[in-house]
Amino acid sequence: MVSLPQDRMRQLEKRFEIIESQMAKNPNAEIYVKLASEYAELQPIVSSIRALNALYGEITDLETIISDKLTDVEMRTLAQEELPLLCQKMEQLEQKLQILLLPKDVADEKSAIVEIRAGTGGSEAALFAGDLFRMYERYAASRNWKVEVVSLNEGEVGGYKEIIATISGRGVFSKLKFESGVHRVQRIPETETGGRIHTSAATVAVLPEAEEIDIEIRPEDIRIDTMRASGAGGQHVNTTDSAVRITHIPTGIMVVQAEKSQHQNRARALQILRARLFDIERQKAENERSASRKSQVGSGDRSERIRTYNFPQGRVTDHRINLTLYKLDRVLEGDLDELIHALISDHQTALLMEMDHHE
């Protein structure tokens, strides 16, 4: 039998009943929307709690029938046959509820900012950064998420030295947050005549997109500089100082945007800065909350080598969970579900172990 936090379950059920009652009173639209959002969040949890309590009652009734010496043989036999089936159903429901009751990452439902930077490997690394961006772009398309490039710096022979994009949709961050880290590629470059395998790398950073309500940026904490935006060969894109550099003085974080519109550059630079500051706060809170946890998947260390894409063998290996898939082509086409589900499952297991440890 799985250990479940009974007090918390009772509190959630009581809160759910209060929300139901308040929604029935037809308050104003703004209050109703907030209540409906909380209702939608609690509904699957409370439904599972109620189903489990009903199941406990059925199991108790069957156990009473089996232990009662006055029960006729046929009734006892039926109860003995049904009991293991209900116990199996109970275990499955307890495990489902255990996952539903896990601590939620406040950023999970948010959109994300994805930053991909070519690392070691020169032009090959830039090409690989391009492959990674297209992989995420296709994955996003399969889920009807919107992708918008914020800024890019193209490689000499293709791909990107750096590309930053927003991926908008519900729950984007929950699916992509484990992509942060160093991605390594092993393949034979087209220019390689000797057939030698080259190793290159690109770094991925996935940040939850932050709203103004999530993180406050005080005007006195930032310095905004404008400068000439230059195109290829150092030519000025236009005659105005359109590039914007924003420095967050307390942390030293610097964001540069160099598109043609100065107004748009300022807005986008603030958007990226807000996301980075929010991510720092989120990581700090996570570390304080679970200082004892050593989950590699959840660490988000961007210097950590997390995955290798081996072209000659057609395989992808995620080093954090020791998972190897021999479907490199499909993964690069955006078929990431198997990898992402395995990473989420591993993270949930680590959280469950942490909860057991605290209990």
UniProtKB/Swiss-Prot annotation:
InterPro entries documented for this protein: PCRF, Pep_chain_release_fac_I, Pep_chain_release_fac_I_sf, Prokaryotic/Mito_RF, RF-1
SUPFAM superfamilies: Release factor (SSF75620)
Residues found modified as N5-methylglutamine: Q235
Post-translational modification: Methylated by PrmC. Methylation increases the termination efficiency of RF1.
GO function term, MF aspect, one: translation release factor activity, codon specific
Cellular localisation: Cytoplasm
UniProt GO cellular component terms: cytoplasm
Highest rank taxon of the organism: Bacteria
Pfam families, per the entry: PCRF (PF03462), RF-1 (PF00472)
Keyword Cell inner membrane tagged: no
Keywords: Cytoplasm, Methylation, Protein biosynthesis
Disordered: region residues: 284-308
PROSITE patterns in the record: RF_PROK_I (PS00745)
Family under the similarity heading: Belongs to the prokaryotic/mitochondrial release factor family.
NCBIfam families tied to this protein: prfA, PRK00591.1
Function, as annotated: Peptide chain release factor 1 directs the termination of translation in response to the peptide chain termination codons UAG and UAA.
UniProt xrefs under HAMAP family: Rel_fac_1
Protein name: Peptide chain release factor 1
